Curated annotation (Swiss-Prot):
GO terms for molecular function: DNA-binding transcription factor activity, RNA polymerase II-specific; RNA polymerase II cis-regulatory region sequence-specific DNA binding. Keywords: Cell projection, Developmental protein, DNA-binding, Homeobox, Nucleus. Belongs to the EMX homeobox family. It comes from Bos taurus (Bovine). The gene is EMX2. The keyword Secreted does not apply. This is Homeobox protein EMX2. Residues 155-214 bind DNA.
Length: 253
């Protein structure tokens, strides 16, 4: 009536000898989006496969999936159409060592070390033309422009501080002669322990001061004369007296 169920053998030999239906299990796996992109590839648009491969590699590098190896496993388990050439997807460590080329090139303003600095400072070349030969070759840099600009300025003359004895002797020499040149200036500079340039500059400044004082004195004298004449005229008008030019002196003879 009822037959006993056959006993199953769970020995190692029976388990190893048993073939697992790999094709069936593979067919039951869920289809992932990456597999759909490979399955839908066609020879009409060969660049689409390369785009999906790069997108999958970038997603793996950013950590979109919990395990980056899943993306590469999908690519292996679902090969694309053999008629269309597909670039292989590099592993994550290769992506880290060799990043994908950026589609945006750096702005030309940031590549200053590769450009001629004279294009940045055209006004400087126009202003200091005699320094133009220095801004050529490997030395052309913004630092060299600023350095040459600072060196191009004429240094300010240091004002000499004369001692009282030196000023006294210079004043005596100026009273004798307002222009000291040649051997006289050289001898005066040597006696005062000064340079000829210092003596020359002092005499130039002293002549300028002398001319200014003379003009001020002449101006003050003319103003005093005008003031005196004005007061005399007012007194004559008030007293109704004639000026000496208007008095006619005649003799009785």
């Amino acid at each position: 009536m009822f037959q006993p169920a056959p006993k199953r053998c769970f020995t190692i030999e029976s388990l190893v000898a048993k073939d697992s239906p790999l094709p069936a299990s593979r067919s039951e796996d869920p289809i992932r989006p990456a597999a759909l992109s490979y399955a839908n590839s066609s020879p009409i648009n060969p660049f689409l496969n390369g785009f999906h491969s790069a997108a999958a590699a970038a997603a793996a590098g950013r950590g979109v999936y919990s395990n980056p190896d899943l993306v590469f496993a999908e690519a292996v388990s679902h090969p694309p159409n053999p008629a269309v050439p597909v670039h292989p997807v590099p592993p994550p460590h290769a992506l880290a060592a060799h990043p994908l080329p950026s589609s945006h090139s750096p702005h030309p303003l940031f590549a200053s070390q590769q450009r001629d600095p004279s294009t940045f400072y055209p006004w400087l070349i126009h202003r200091y033309r005699y320094l133009g030969h220095r801004f050529q070759g490997n030395d052309a840099s913004p630092e060299s422009f600023l350095l040459h600009n600072a060196l191009a300025r004429k240094p300010k003359r240091i004002r000499t501080a004369f001692s009282p004895s030196q000023l006294l002797r210079l004043e005596h020499a100026f009273e004798k002669n307002h222009y000291v040149v040649g051997a006289e200036r050289k001898q005066l500079a040597h006696s005062l322990s000064l340079t000829e340039t210092q003596v020359k500059v002092w005499f130039q400044n002293r002549r300028t001061k002398f001319k200014r004082q003379k003009l001020e004195e002449e101006g003050s004298d003319s103003q005093q004369k005008k003031k005196g004449t004005h007061h005399i005229n007012r007194w004559r008008i008030a007293t109704k007296q004639a000026s000496p030019e208007e008095i006619d002196v005649t003799s009785d003879d």
